[in-house]
A protein has these predicted regions:
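Catalytic domains of lipid- and phosphate-ester/thioester hydrolases
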Residues: 21-517
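Bacterial N-terminal signal peptides
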Residues: 9-20
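Bacterial N-terminal signal peptides that target proteins for export
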Residues: 1-9
C-alpha cells in the first residue's frame, strides 16, 4: 500500500513539475511598456534665489552634494556643515552654510542635511542661535541618529530584514532625526509639523516665498538601477498613492488618490535613499491603477556621491549665469584603495561580500574628478567652480606637515596595535587628554553633565594642531566602518574631522562665494 501511494505521489509531483514549467511563458521584450522616471527639473518651482538677500547672494547658485557611507557619512558631513557656518563673508551676515541653495544627498548623507534643514525651519529662524550653538547645546533633547544596529550578517538573513520592525524606519527617522513626535504632540522639544517636500519646493503659482534651500534625496529603482530624485514632479509622475512601509499596515501618503508630490514626507525619501539591500528594508510604494509596486533601494547603487542630481539642479537654475554656478562635494568614503594582494588563505564569504561592495563603490570614485569635469563642461560651467572635502583633505594636509618625534611615536604605536575597538578607545582617550592639555578647557564646550565635548574645539585653534594630533584624528575617523549604530567617541571624532577638513579649505571655499563678474 505504501508503495502504491508513493508511486501516485511521484506521478503527481512529476505532473505538477512539468505543468509548472509549461506555465512559464515567454515574456516578449518587444511588448515592454517602459515609462521613464521624470528627470530633474526646476521648471514648475519658484526659484530659491527669491530667498532673503540678507542670507544669500541671488547671483550665485551654490549646491552641496553629500555622499553615502552610513553613520560615518552622517557625522563627518554634519561636521562639515558645522564648519561651513564658520566661514563668514566679509561685511555681511552671510556665511557659506546660509548661502547653500541646493542639497543633493545619498544614503547616510541625507541624515545630516535633513537634520540641519529641520532645525533651520523650526528653530534657527525663530531664535538667534547659530547652528553650532544649537547643535552642541541641544544634543540631549534633539537626537540626530537612529538607534538601530545592523551588520553584514544581516545580509545572510534578508527574509527577517524584509519583514521590518514594529516601528518602521520612516517613523523612526521622523521621530529621531527629523524631530517630528507624532505620538506626543505636547512634547516641547519636538517639532509639531512633519517635514514635507513642500517645505523645499514652492510651486510658481503659490503666494508663498521660498525660505529654505532645496533638498533632494536620491534613491535607486530596484528593478533597473535607475536614479530617482525625490522631487514633487517626480513623485507625481510616478503615480505613487501609498507607501508599503515595512510594518503591519499600509501607510497612506495623504487623502488623495495620487500624491501630488508636495505633500510627500521627507522621511520617505531619506528612508528609500538609505535602504542598503539586506541591511535596511527596501522602500516600497503603491502605484495607482497597477498591480505593481515601485521598490527603491540605496541611492548609492546609482550614484553614491549625489553629483549627478546636483549638477542637473544647477543647470536647471535659470536665474543665475553659468559662470556663477558653484558646487561643493562632501566625500565620506573613509578607507583608501585596497592593495590587490591577499594572504594565501581560504576566501571567506563575508570578506568576499565586503570586497565586492567596496569595488562597486570605488570603480565610480576612481573616475569621480573626471566625471565631474566632463559634466561641468557639458553644462558650460567653469571647471574651477567646485571643491571636494573629504577624509583625503586631512590626509593631503598631513602629508605636507613637518613630522616630529611625537608623530613618529604615534605612527609606531598605530602600526603595532591590533585593529580592535578597545585599542581605538585608548588612542581616543589619549588624544582627548592631549588636546585639553594643549589648548585648555576653555577652548571646548561642556555638555549638561559637565563633560568636555571634544568636537567643539574652537576653530581658531585648528592651525595649532600638530601632525601627531591630525594623524590620530585622521586614522580614527577614516577607520569608522559604514554602519548604522555609532559610538559617542566615533561621533566626536567624525564631527571634529569634518570641521577641521572644512577649515583647511577656507580659502578655496571663500573663492566659491565670490561672484564672477
Amino acid at each position: 500500500m505504501k508503495y502504491k501511494y508513493s508511486k501516485i505521489f511521484l506521478i503527481l509531483y512529476f505532473f505538477s513539475f512539468q505543468l509548472g514549467f509549461s506555465q512559464n511563458k515567454i515574456s516578449l521584450f518587444s511588448e515592454i511598456n517602459y515609462n521613464s522616471i521624470p528627470p530633474v527639473s526646476l521648471n514648475e518651482y519658484k526659484s530659491v534665489q527669491e530667498r532673503d538677500k540678507k542670507f544669500q547672494n541671488p547671483n550665485i547658485a551654490l549646491g552641496v552634494a553629500i555622499s553615502g557611507g552610513g553613520s560615518r557619512a552622517q557625522f563627518f558631513s554634519m561636521g562639515v556643515l558645522l564648519g561651513l557656518e564658520e566661514i563668514n563673508e566679509e561685511n555681511s551676515q552671510r556665511n557659506f552654510l546660509k548661502e547653500i541653495d541646493y542639497f543633493s544627498t545619498v544614503s547616510g548623507g541625507c541624515y545630516s542635511a535633513g537634520y540641519y534643514l529641520t532645525i533651520l525651519k523650526n528653530k534657527l529662524y525663530q531664535g538667534h542661535q547659530s547652528f553650532n550653538e544649537f547643535y552642541f547645546s541641544k544634543a540631549d533633547a534633539y537626537k540626530d541618529y537612529v538607534n538601530k544596529s545592523a551588520s553584514i550578517l544581516s545580509l545572510l538573513n534578508n527574509n527577517k530584514n524584509e519583514k521590518g520592525d514594529k516601528i518602521s524606519m520612516s517613523q523612526q527617522l521622523d521621530l529621531e532625526v527629523l524631530q517630528y513626535d507624532c505620538t506626543n504632540p505636547d512634547n516641547p522639544d519636538k517639532c509639531k509639523t512633519q517635514m514635507l517636500l513642500s517645505d523645499f519646493f514652492i510651486p510658481k503659482e503659490s503666494t508663498l516665498r521660498p525660505y529654505l534651500p532645496m533638498m533632494v534625496a536620491n534613491g535607486t529603482a530596484y528593478n533597473n538601477g535607475e536614479r530617482i530624485a525625490f522631487m514633487p514632479h517626480v513623485i507625481r509622475g510616478l503615480n505613487i498613492n501609498s507607501s508599503l512601509a515595512p510594518n503591519k499596515a499600509t501607510v497612506c501618503l495623504d487623502e488623495n488618490e495620487v500624491n501630488d508630490g508636495y505633500e510627500f514626507p521627507l522621511t520617505y525619501g531619506i528612508t528609500a535613499s538609505s535602504a542598503f539591500p539586506g541591511v535596511l528594508p527596501k522602500t516600497k510604494f503603491g502605484i495607482k491603477g497597477q498591480n505593481k509596486i515601485l521598490c527603491i533601494i540605496d541611492g548609492g547603487a546609482s550614484d553614491n556621491t549625489g553629483y549627478k542630481t546636483l549638477l542637473e539642479l544647477l543647470h536647471s537654475d535659470s536665474k543665475v549665469n553659468d559662470k556663477n554656478k558653484k558646487a561643493l562635494f562632501i566625500d565620506c568614503l573613509g578607507q583608501g584603495k585596497k592593495e590587490p594582494y591577499i594572504t594565501d588563505e581560504k576566501i571567506k564569504l563575508i570578506s568576499l561580500l565586503e570586497t565586492t561592495s567596496l569595488y562597486t563603490v570605488q570603480t565610480r570614485y576612481m573616475t569621480f574628478d573626471r566625471d565631474i569635469e566632463n559634466a561641468f563642461e557639458r553644462y558650460k560651467i567653469p571647471v574651477s567652480n567646485y571643491q571636494i572635502i573629504g577624509f583625503t583633505t586631512l590626509r593631503d594636509h598631513l602629508l605636507k606637515m613637518k613630522k616630529d618625534e611625537s608623530y613618529q611615536t604615534i605612527m609606531a604605536e598605530l602600526k603595532n596595535a591590533d585593529d580592535d575597538y578597545s585599542n581605538w578607545l585608548k588612542f581616543y582617550g589619549k588624544f582627548k587628554h592631549d588636546l585639553v592639555e594643549q589648548f585648555g578647557e576653555l577652548s571646548f564646550t561642556r555638555d549638561k553633565d559637565g563633560e568636555i565635548i571634544l568636537a567643539t574645539l574652537t576653530h581658531n585653534k585648528f592651525n595649532e594642531l600638530t601632525a601627531a594630533n591630525i594623524l590620530i584624528l585622521y586614522e580614527f575617523a577614516s577607520h569608522v566602518e559604514t554602519k548604522l549604530k555609532i559610538t559617542p567617541e566615533e561621533r566626536e571624532m567624525l564631527l571634529l574631522s569634518g570641521r577641521l577638513a572644512t577649515f583647511l579649505k577656507t580659502k578655496e571655499l571663500k573663492n566659491l562665494l565670490t561672484e564672477n563678474k
